[in-house]
Swiss-Prot record:
<dbReference type="InterPro" id="IPR000873">
    <property type="entry name" value="AMP-dep_synth/lig_dom"/>
</dbReference>
<feature type="domain" description="Carrier">
    <location>
        <begin position="570"/>
        <end position="647"/>
    </location>
</feature>
<dbReference type="GO" id="GO:0016740">
    <property type="term" value="F:transferase activity"/>
</dbReference>
<feature type="region of interest" description="Adenylation (A) domain">
    <location>
        <begin position="31"/>
        <end position="440"/>
    </location>
</feature>
<dbReference type="Pfam" id="PF00501">
    <property type="entry name" value="AMP-binding"/>
</dbReference>
<dbReference type="InterPro" id="IPR001031">
    <property type="entry name" value="Thioesterase"/>
</dbReference>
<dbReference type="InterPro" id="IPR045851">
    <property type="entry name" value="AMP-bd_C_sf"/>
</dbReference>
<dbReference type="GO" id="GO:0006633">
    <property type="term" value="P:fatty acid biosynthetic process"/>
</dbReference>
<comment type="similarity">
    <text>Belongs to the NRP synthetase family.</text>
</comment>
<dbReference type="Pfam" id="PF00550">
    <property type="entry name" value="PP-binding"/>
</dbReference>
<dbReference type="InterPro" id="IPR009081">
    <property type="entry name" value="PP-bd_ACP"/>
</dbReference>
<dbReference type="InterPro" id="IPR036736">
    <property type="entry name" value="ACP-like_sf"/>
</dbReference>
<dbReference type="InterPro" id="IPR042099">
    <property type="entry name" value="ANL_N_sf"/>
</dbReference>
<dbReference type="InterPro" id="IPR020845">
    <property type="entry name" value="AMP-binding_CS"/>
</dbReference>
<dbReference type="GO" id="GO:0031177">
    <property type="term" value="F:phosphopantetheine binding"/>
</dbReference>
<dbReference type="InterPro" id="IPR029058">
    <property type="entry name" value="AB_hydrolase_fold"/>
</dbReference>
<comment type="function">
    <text>Nonribosomal peptide synthetase; part of the gene cluster that mediates the biosynthesis of butyrolactones, natural products that show a wide range of biological activities such as antitumor, antiparasitic or anti-inflammatory activity. The nonribosomal peptide synthetase btyA is responsible for the production of butyrolactone II, the core structure of butyrolactones. BtyA first activates 4-hydroxyphenylpyruvate (HPPA) through its A domain to AMP-HPPA. The HPPA unit is then loaded to the T domain and eventually transferred to the TE domain.</text>
</comment>
Length: 930
């Protein structure tokens, strides 16, 4: 039986589709490509192979580093080396820093055992003369007197040929930053190509389109070898042209009737942004119905971004709705080995923030093993180590036995280094790299989730797509901290923009991790992206830890200290001094960063920080500070004045609490859930920093002597008047959380009562419109149980089991039993006393009674419904819960929009979920023109 290898692939394509081949656009030219047929490529490769065979150092089996620019040179000389029986090693771009470049080349010289390097004369200057690389430029290669002869030239190999011989080596970065060499054999590549073709079926579609350099396996395997395997045309364009203007990608798809291309998440985001800037689809009359596969990998795919792009491409240009296919692959698997052909439907149903990656293709088996035992897991929800096996997976690193031992299990499975789960639907879901997890005080955070939250915040002064997060342990620290580096979009001397960007990033970091991140802007020469658009998180982390960025740190610190537009004001009296001391301790900031006139909520303080500061300040001052005084005081100076004047009792009821005063967009008004407290919104408000002001409305009855509202309408009247005092004119954006949805609806109607459409946005956060009749049936005990669950004093499933135990007990005894079951740490975090919980429960019960007889009527301009996983007491399935939410349709004049949210009803504003709520809420308001 005749065996085949890569040479047979090109021979077959050259003989079968003589007119087909490769179109190459030169950098800066996207109008007139150069054409190279597969037959011409084979002829050039065979001719060069004969010449190489006459030259010393190019014997069959020799390693040759291929360091060339441009697709044409790389293709011709890659195949020339393969035909000559040599093993090409695809070089990666060299670092600009001379010492880093020298270190890399010395490492390659050792790793590859003193190879020859094939390059162009114009690139030889990139090699420091003291490194001693053996260079051979392609211009000097000419025909010799002894032609290279081999049975591999122009005819299939004989039966004795070993198809497991190494075909080529790819270089990939290791954990130390030094490159590892990945050997790809003929049999491995052929297995991978067969698996890809079985899934993608390129033979049935048009050409491929590539913009990625040949040093990346996605370009070489997916966009060069695979089209040859499928005997279809391939188009190549310079990366700089596509990244500079992503719409060129669509223009070329239309022009060449492209069936498959590739774009990582960052390019999809740029493409969406470019399309949204277009005046109308008619300005670009493209027909993109030919595009079957828009593969995406290399970084996590944000579902919202990709789904919006998919809708735009489908509606405006005829692209199939399942065109975008998030994929997983590595150099070690010959690029893509798992493709998601159910995007975005699968992600929408399962409410994923980041796209799943489908199922493994033929030739690759996948398993997830336990982080603790190393055994394969059976639980589809368990995150573990992703491991691969099969003929499409490599067998070990070249000349690096230690890395090979570390990367394979005793039973021969490849450890990818990724954390993952394979869900009940068989879909691969990545959860980050195991070595990149950020561990802070025992809690683990995924860097790409923090990066995504910063991107979502659209921080002014931060270049999109150039933010990197990682764990960083300063000297003498007991735990890791979060470090965030970014590429500034402002001039170096612009200290105002520098300070605003830093503060905004700090706010997001606090909300995501509960800790204050270390923030550092770096320049474009340092934050260099790979050919696939990735920045090496490990290299940046190593640079920070080694002191390589000391100059950036000194410049950043010096310029931040120069900022005087909002000077940090020191304490002016004893009360301010004591309050400030408590704040500096609890908020983990210095007196240079935080003063008595620093806006507390805008600074990024979380609700738990606020409670901890309250407790610390009370200890120092020796008396209680009402929470009302704190949340109604924007600064320490205002709070100190209240305390000194004795005006920290109940006073006159004012429902408005400004949580975030900054921003130019329409203010957002948030109405409390049952229980009446607004601290639940603190973290959410912080994410809107510099975007739009955020005000919350607190219930009457939280303080001694305040009577609760007797009805939904009474509360709505009070809130309407309060909103009008602060914001006399529309447009208005109003949202309510749970119980607050009913009040918010009534407030929106009052604001909209003159028919001027002054409320473009009314949002209901997880409560159906006719739920008042259920709430009104809650007695005091049920109010206590639901309040305790919402405060995380008890688990949600304990509501029913504890009900029978508490019912009939005296109220003080029931309070004691709840506090006895609650985690002590949670009680301390909430600063909760029996008397405080009693008052809170009475208010909750009174608010429940206020819903008696309430039935929503009338309409507001629009309704946006946000719904979660249902509580067992409210609905048994998500579909049942959504059906109840659909009743909101009758209360909006425009089409009601429904937005799924992750998490449970009572946990929406928790640290794990709040940034996701922000993302969905913010985009819903943008869609309503706000």
């Amino acid at each position: 039986m005749t065996k085949i290898d890569l040479i047979n692939l090109l021979d077959h394509a050259a003989d079968t589709v003589a007119a087909s081949g490769i179109l190459i656009y030169s950098p800066g030219n996207v109008e007139s490509p150069h054409r190279l047929t597969y037959a011409e490529l084979r002829d050039a490769a065979q001719q060069n192979a004969r010449r190489l065979g006459c030259m010393e150092g190019f014997a069959p089996g020799s390693l040759v580093l291929l360091h060339l620019d441009g697709y044409r040179d790389n293709m011709i000389w890659l195949w020339s080396l393969i035909y000559a029986g040599c093993i090409p090693v695809m070089s990666t771009p060299f670092a600009h820093h001379e010492e880093h470049r020298r270190s890399h080349l010395l490492h390659l010289q050792s790793l590859l055992r003193d190879p020859i390097c094939l390059t162009r004369q114009g690139l030889e200057a990139q090699f420091p003369p003291d490194v001693g690389f053996r260079l051979c430029n392609i211009e000097s290669i000419s025909g010799g007197s002894n032609p290279f002869t081999s049975p591999r030239l122009g005819q299939p190999p004989g039966q004795d040929d070993n198809v497991d011989d190494i075909a080529l080596l790819m270089l990939t970065s290791g954990s130390t930053g030094h490159a590892k060499a990945v050997p790809l054999t003929h049999s491995q590549l052929l297995s991978a190509l067969a698996g890809k073709e079985r899934f993608l079926q390129l033979r049935q579609h048009g050409p491929s389109l590539n913009w990625v350099a040949f040093d990346h396996i996605a370009s070489l395997a997916e966009m060069h070898f695979h089209p040859i395997f499928a005997c279809i045309d391939q188009v190549h364009v310079a990366a700089a042209d596509v990244i500079t203007d992503p719409l060129i990608l669509l223009e070329l798809i239309h022009r060449h009737r492209v069936g498959i291309t590739f774009a990582p998440n960052f390019l999809l985001a740029k493409l969406l942004d470019s399309l949204e800037r277009e005046p109308s689809p008619s300005s670009r009359p493209w027909d993109l119905s030919c595009l079957m596969h828009l593969l995406s990998g290399g970084e996590a795919n944000v579902v919202d971004t990709c789904a919006r792009l998919a809708r735009r491409l489908t509606q405006d240009y005829g692209v199939p709705s399942t065109c975008i296919k998030p994929a997983f692959g590595m150099t070690e698997t010959c690029a893509g080995c798992s493709f998601n052909d159910r995007f975005p439907t699968y992600e929408t149903v399962h409410m994923l923030d980041f796209a799943s990656l489908g199922r493994g293709v033929k030739g690759v088996q996948m398993r997830v093993t336990s982080l603790s035992t190393g055994q394969p897991v059976d639980d589809h929800s368990e995150v573990g180590n992703l491991e691969l096996s099969g003929p499409s997976v490599f067998r070990g690193y070249y000349n690096n036995s230690q890395a090979t031992r570390d990367s394979f299990t005793p039973d021969g499975w490849f450890r990818t280094g990724d954390l993952a789960m394979i869900d009940a639907g068989g879909q691969l879901v990545l959860r980050g790299r195991s070595k990149e997890l950020i561990c802070i005080n025992g809690a683990k955070y995924l860097p790409h989730e923090v990066e995504s939250a910063i991107e979502d915040a659209k921080v002014r002064g931060v270049t999109p797509g150039f933010t990197i997060c990682f764990g960083y342990r300063p000297a003498k620290a007991q735990t890791e901290s979060l470090a965030v580096v970014y590429l500034p979009a402002y001039e170096e001397a612009d200290v105002e923009s520098r300070s605003q960007a830093q503060n905004a990033i700090i706010r997001v970091g606090l909300i995501m991790t509960g800790t204050r991140p270390y923030v550092l802007p770096l320049d474009a020469h340092t934050l260099v992206k790979s050919s696939l658009g990735k920045i090496s998180r490990n290299k940046i982390k190593t640079g920070l830890e080694s002191g390589a960025f000391q100059a950036f740190e000194e410049t950043n610190n010096r310029l931040l200290k120069l900022r005087q537009s909002t000077p940090v004001v020191p304490a002016g009296n004893e009360t301010e001094t004591l309050l400030l001391a408590a704040a500096l301790h609890v908020f983990r900031v210095t007196a240079d960063e935080f003063g008595v006139e620093t806006p507390m909520f805008a600074f990024g303080i979380t609700s738990l920080d606020m409670i901890a500061w309250k407790r610390q300040a009370e200890t120092i001052l020796g008396h209680e500070i009402p929470m009302l005084a704190i949340i109604t005081s924007p600064t320490i100076r205002v709070l100190a004045r209240q305390l000194q004047d004795g005006h920290h009792g109940p006073g006159e009821y004012n429902p408005v609490v400004t949580l975030q005063p900054h921003g130019s967009k329409t203010p957002l008004w948030l109405i409390h859930p049952i229980g009446g407290e607004v601290l639940v919104f603190v973290s959410l408000a912080g994410l809107f920093a510099d975007d739009r002001p955020v005000h919350a409305l607190r219930a009457r009855g939280l303080n001694r002597g305040e009577p609760p509202f007797g009805s939904i309408h009474e509360a709505a009247d009070a809130y309407y008047q309060a909103i009008k005092r602060v914001q006399p004119h529309g447009p208005y954006a109003v949202a309510g959380y749970s119980y607050g949805s009913l009040v918010a609806f009534e407030v929106a109607k009052r604001l909209d009562q003159h028919g001027k459409d002054e409320v473009p946005f009314f949002g209901s956060l997880d409560l159906p419109p006719f739920h008042a009749q259920i709430i009104s049936k809650s007695d005091w005990t049920e109010s206590l149980l639901h309040l305790a669950s919402s405060l995380s004093l008890i688990a949600e499933e304990e509501i029913n089991t504890l009900g029978a135990d508490l019912r009939g007990l005296p109220q003080p005894r029931a309070i004691q039993k709840i506090l006895a079951r609650a985690p002590p740490r949670r009680i301390r975090e909430l600063d909760l006393s029996p008397d405080g919980l009693m008052r809170w429960t009475k208010l909750t019960s009174a608010m429940a009674q206020a819903t008696r007889g309430y039935v929503p009527v009338g309409q507001t301009r629009s309704v946006d419904v946000f719904y979660t996983e249902p509580s067992g007491a409210l609905a048994t399935t998500r579909d049942e819960w959504l059906d109840r939410h659909r009743e909101w349709r009758q209360f909006g004049r425009l089409e009601t929009q429904f937005h799924p949210l992750e998490g449970l009803h009572y946990r929406l504003m928790d640290e794990d979920n709040v940034h996701k709520v922000y993302r969905v809420l913010s985009r819903a308001m943008d869609a309503r023109g706000l």
